[in-house]
Swiss-Prot record:
Residues 301-683 are annotated as: Disordered. GO terms for molecular function: actin binding; microtubule binding. This is GAS2-like protein 3. Residues 50-170 form the Calponin-homology (CH) domain. It comes from Mus musculus (Mouse). GO terms for cellular component: actin cytoskeleton; cytoplasm; microtubule; microtubule cytoskeleton.
Length: 683
């Protein structure tokens, strides 16, 4: 009989064995490598299943007539088809062996899906039918397994024990059981005879396992490898054939298929190596030492890793919201804006916000439209920085007179003086709370609006000034509310002058006003600021009657000329605050306005105009303005040309434009605080 090389070591042949071999000697790789020892222990547990696996594969192959390999036993059984076939074979064999009393053994037809795939639902169904049959024939629940245990190979030991129990049951009806079941019966008979006679001598019982010499040599080899160096050696004492004494225990040892040395333990079987690992005092000490070392190893790893883990793992970056805002500001300050601007910007933004609730109570006619467009504003805050400071200066110069001209429309006879006083009156009315510098921020946006309406930019791709404009519009609801709520009282001419440059039509085109248009504004509008304050007072009173402004009217009539010539910063503020008023009026034109129906909504006007159109618009604005200055009495219905007078700026506007780039930079630096301030103010 040829034996496997891994088995020959039990019979005195020295062959190198790997720890993965199921029949490796009990001492294993040693305690130096704990992980390797754990792996070896797992292999030893698998080794206890190998004898049952081989025995069952031989038994099933004989019953079913199919060659089943021990290594692939679970793969052959996991779809449940062979198990259902086993039921039919066993029932037929029970009928043939016990034709007289077949009623004791339950006979039933078990449904089976023969083409079930491994791991499929049908495989689970076949396995469930087999387990149902096992319960009917009397298999105890302790031997049964779950369907998943077989289908997914989760519990091979329980599957083997169940098959062995079926072999024990069918052996009662004359069916040949597995060899392990035969050995169990021999041992049971031997124990019964020994207990009955009370003798320790061996009783002559036919042994089907193997010859006595082979079994004894295998037991000696396993027990003495490695040699024990203890003072009180714990050895296996031979009593009789297949009977040994280990300490106070009597062991029944059998050889299975000439390869496996099996020990009868309780109601099952174990290999001699596994049994010695559990019950030999020397090996128990070895196991205890191993367990302690494993626990110490695990605790050591956990204790060492806990203090070291914070040092190994890099610290996450500190999440400081202010640092994120500072980074945002630095990225936006790349065009050359000073770093100290955001602080001033915060102050300037907070001041209008503090005054906003006082005047916002008066009305809410203009605010809905601006608030409706506010969601667009935060989308692209960083882009307004792209506009150069020169462009900002040009923007500041251009709209300063556009407001005055748009307000001058009610009185065509005295357009320049009326417009100037109108701007003065609006400035006086708005800036009386001593915050002229605070209004500088909205001034630039108003200039952006006026220039964007009448001078479509050459760089239409930059959409962000619109959003900034809307952002500041919502923050300046007070000025627009005062005029927009009372806008229906304005003359039709004023309405015709304002609806045409609808503040929200092409605001995306703001960023790059041409220098030519700026020059035109300087040339054409240098005259009106020097008009007589008398007509300015008349127009101021006219504005007071039309707009119903309470306190600033008297101030406006008295000092329009002085403020016009003296303080150009205040003129810029007046333009800034007057422009939102005109915007508010444009949003709410009077019912008598003939131009309001022709105004295009913001949602429709999305395509920016080309640079050539910008040139023509500026030229037409210039010519229209000259024509109206020459003939001071055009009808009120012919006010659309006045809308083209908005881009040119006065001398004051040019001067203020020189002063306002810093304010423009402050405006464009940080829009985060502008938006949050508006939100808080709305609450």
């Amino acid at each position: 009989m040829t034996m496997q090389p891994a088995i020959q070591v039990w019979f005195g042949e020295d062959l190198p064995l790997s720890p993965r071999c199921p029949l490796t000697p009990r001492h294993g790789p040693g305690l130096a490598d704990v992980c390797q020892y754990d792996e070896w222990i797992a292999v030893r547990h698998e080794a206890t299943l190998l004898p049952m696996q081989e025995d069952l594969s031989i038994w099933l192959s004989g019953l079913l007539g199919v060659d089943i390999k021990a290594e692939r036993l679970l793969e052959e059984l996991d779809n449940g088809v062979l198990l259902c076939q086993l039921i039919n074979v066993l029932q037929n064999m029970v009928k043939g062996c016990h034709s007289d009393e077949p009623g004791n053994f339950p006979m039933r037809k078990v449904p089976c899906k023969k083409d079930a795939a491994s791991g499929s639902f049908f495989a689970r169904d076949n396995t469930a039918n087999f387990l149902h049959w096992c319960r009917h024939i009397g298999v105890d629940e302790t031997y049964l397994f779950e369907s998943e245990g077989l289908v997914l190979h989760k519990d091979p030991r329980q599957v083997y024990l169940c098959l062995l129990e079926i072999g024990r049951i069918v052996s009662r009806y004359g069916v040949e059981p597995p060899v392990l079941v035969k050995l169990e019966k021999e041992i049971e008979l031997e124990e019964t005879l020994l207990n009955a006679s009370g003798l320790e001598e061996s009783i002559s019982i036919p042994k089907s396992c193997c010859q006595q010499e082979e079994l004894h040599e295998a037991v000696k080899h396993i027990a003495e490898d490695p040699p024990c160096s203890c003072s009180h050696r714990f050895s296996i004492e031979y009593l009789s054939e297949g009977r040994y004494r280990l300490g106070e225990k009597i062991l029944f040892i059998r050889m299975l298929h000439g390869k496996h040395v099996m020990v009868r333990v309780g109601g099952g079987w174990d290999t001699l190596q596994g049994f010695l690992l559990k019950y030999d005092p020397c090996r128990i000490l070895q196991f205890a030492t191993l367990e302690q070392k494993i626990l110490a190893f695990q605790k050591g790893v956990s204790n060492e890793s806990v203090p070291d883990s914070p040092a190994r793992t890099p610290k996450p970056p500190e999440m400081n919201p202010l640092s994120a805002v500072n980074m945002f500001q630095k990225q936006n300050l790349r065009p050359g804006t000073p770093v100290s601007v955001p602080k001033n910007k915060e102050k300037q933004v907070r001041l209008p916000g503090a005054r906003l609730p006082a005047s916002s109570v008066k009305g809410n006619l203009a605010s809905p439209s601006t608030r409706a467009k506010r969601p667009d504003s935060p989308a692209s805050f960083p882009h307004p920085k792209v506009t150069s400071l020169k462009d900002a200066a040009k923007k500041t110069t251009a709209p300063s007179n556009s407001v005055s001209q748009s307000l001058a429309s009610p009185n065509p006879g005295s357009k320049p003086s009326t417009a100037q006083c109108a701007s003065e009156s609006s400035r006086k009315c708005v800036t009386f709370p001593k915050t002229a510098q605070t209004k500088a921020i909205p001034a630039q946006n108003s200039r952006d609006l006026s220039k964007s309406r009448l001078l479509p930019s050459k760089s239409p791709g930059k959409m962000e000034p619109k959003h900034l404009k809307h952002n500041h519009l919502s923050s300046r609801d007070e000025s627009r509310i005062n005029l927009s709520s009372k806008s229906p009282k304005l003359p039709k001419g004023a309405m015709h002058g304002r609806p045409n440059p609808s503040p929200f039509q092409p605001p995306a085109k703001v960023t790059k006003p041409s220098s030519k248009t700026g020059a035109i504004g300087l040339g054409t509008q240098s005259q009106p600021p020097t008009r007589t304050p008398r007509s300015g007072a008349v127009s101021a009173q006219r504005l007071q009657s039309t707009l119903n402004l309470n306190s600033p009217a008297s101030v406006c009539s008295g000092s329009s000329a002085k403020a016009t010539q003296g303080s150009k910063g205040k003129n810029t503020v007046s333009v800034a605050k007057k422009q939102p008023q005109s915007k508010g009026v444009c949003r709410n034109p009077g019912p008598g306005s003939s131009k309001s129906p022709g105004r295009t909504p913001l949602s429709i006007v999305t395509v920016p105009q080309s640079a050539t159109k910008t040139e023509t618009v500026s030229k037409s604005a210039k010519t229209a303005m000259k024509g109206q200055y020459s003939a001071k009495g055009p009808p009120k219905s012919s006010k659309p040309p006045t809308s083209f007078r908005d881009p040119p700026s006065s001398g004051k506007g040019a001067d203020s434009g020189d002063k306002m780039p810093t304010a423009r930079k402050k405006e464009e630096d940080d829009h985060y605080f502008v938006m949050t301030g508006n939100k808080k103010l709305r609450k």
